Every structure is written in C-alpha cells, then in structure tokens.
C-alpha cells in the first residue's frame, strides 16, 4: 500500500514519515565520498585541514573522524605520506593559527595520541556509525566510534584516555586551557 499513490520522491519520503514516524532511520554519505579527491585536497598546500566532527550533533548526524580518515588514506600510500599527513594535521594548522611551535624533548609538556596502526589499516569511518541512547543528553543519538583505533590520549604527558575509556585524571585535574584570541 505504501507508495502506490505517490507522485514524486518528496511525497514518498513524507509517506514514509507518516507510516513509520520515529522508527524510520537512514544514513548516507554527505560529502568526501571519493578518497582520491579527499587525499588531493588534504595534501593541497593552499588548504589547511579543518575541524572534524565525530558525532557532536544530537540525534541526526554522525560524521567520520576526518583526521583518522586522513591518516588512513596516507597509510594506503606510504610511511612517508603518513609522516607528512601527521604534519598537515598538527604543526601546519598550529603555525597557521599562530600557536607556538612544539617539539618533543626532555622536560617539555607533550600532548599526543597513540594510534594502533593495525586498527588504522582496517578503519572504515562509515561502518562505525551507531544509534544509541546517551544518558548525558537524555536521548538517542547517532555516534561514530572508532573503538580500538586510538590506544591512548595524553595531555601534558598525562594519560586521559586509555583506549577503552577516560582515566581518573580526566575532568579532575586541569591539564590545558582555552586558546587566546589574537589581536586583529
């Protein structure tokens, strides 16, 4: 019966909503569908990789993690490209935004994450989307989780994520701060 009197795609969609109401769920790739085009853009020196959203939108959107996907695309190419992509995702944006250069050295405070290369080799961002209830928001939400891929996150050298959850340090001790606006 559904769709027998439908005249166009819009009317069909409305009839689906009328029939299934809140039980109707779907997903689609909205952008960045072609990996070669994405890689070309990520490597363009005139562009800076930007903000990536992994599911902050309540209920209706769950984007893949663009930074992990960028590393995955680079991994398909070579170790040298992984190193270059890491620079594109970290020090190049920092330089563009006027953040002080940071290196790794004795006595320096380090922010870093550990990515499991075997998990990265298998990573497909679109396949990790789930619809789950979030107590924090009191509703269901689309989320994109890359479990097992990030083995640890460290802020000022202190582990705040251990690969399966936040550590006791997270949210208890101040480890960072907001960036200051630069005068225009």
Where are these regions (language model features)?
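Hydrophobic alpha-helix feature that most strongly marks membrane-spanning transmembrane helices
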Residues: 18, 46, 72-79, 90-94, ...
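Short, well-structured alpha-helical segments that form the helix of a local strand-helix-strand
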Residues: 13-16, 82-90
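Cofactor-binding beta-sheet edge motifs in enzyme active sites
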Residues: 66-70, 171, 178
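Active-site neighborhoods of metal-dependent hydrolases
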Residues: 1-78
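Acidic, glycine-enriched loop/beta-strand segments at the rims
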Residues: 27-31, 81-84, 94-127
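C-terminal cap of metal-dependent C-N hydrolases
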Residues: 39-47, 112-165, 169-173
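Feature captures the catalytic cores and cofactor-binding loops of soluble hydro-lyases/lyases
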Residues: 60, 64, 68-77, 88, ...
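Short, solvent-exposed cationic patches
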Residues: 177-184
């Amino acid at each position: 019966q559904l769709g027998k009197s439908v005249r166009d795609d819009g009317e069909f969609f409305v009839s689906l909503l009328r029939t299934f109401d809140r039980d109707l769920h779907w997903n689609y790739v909205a952008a960045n569908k072609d990996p070669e085009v994405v890689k070309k853009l990520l490597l363009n020196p005139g562009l800076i990789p930007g903000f990536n959203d992994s599911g902050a939108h309540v209920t209706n959107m769950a984007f893949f993690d663009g930074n992990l996907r960028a590393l995955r695309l680079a991994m398909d190419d070579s170790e040298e490209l992984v190193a270059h992509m890491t620079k594109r995702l970290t020090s190049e944006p920092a330089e563009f935004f006027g953040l002080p250069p940071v290196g790794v050295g004795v006595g320096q405070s380090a922010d870093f994450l550990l990515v499991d290369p075997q998990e990265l080799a298998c990573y497909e961002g679109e396949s990790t989307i789930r619809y789950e209830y979030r107590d924090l928001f009191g509703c269901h939400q689309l989320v994109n989780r890359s479990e097992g891929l990030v083995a640890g996150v460290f802020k000022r050298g202190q582990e705040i994520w251990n690969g399966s959850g936040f550590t006791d340090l997270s949210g208890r001790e101040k480890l960072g701060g907001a960036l200051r606006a630069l005068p225009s």
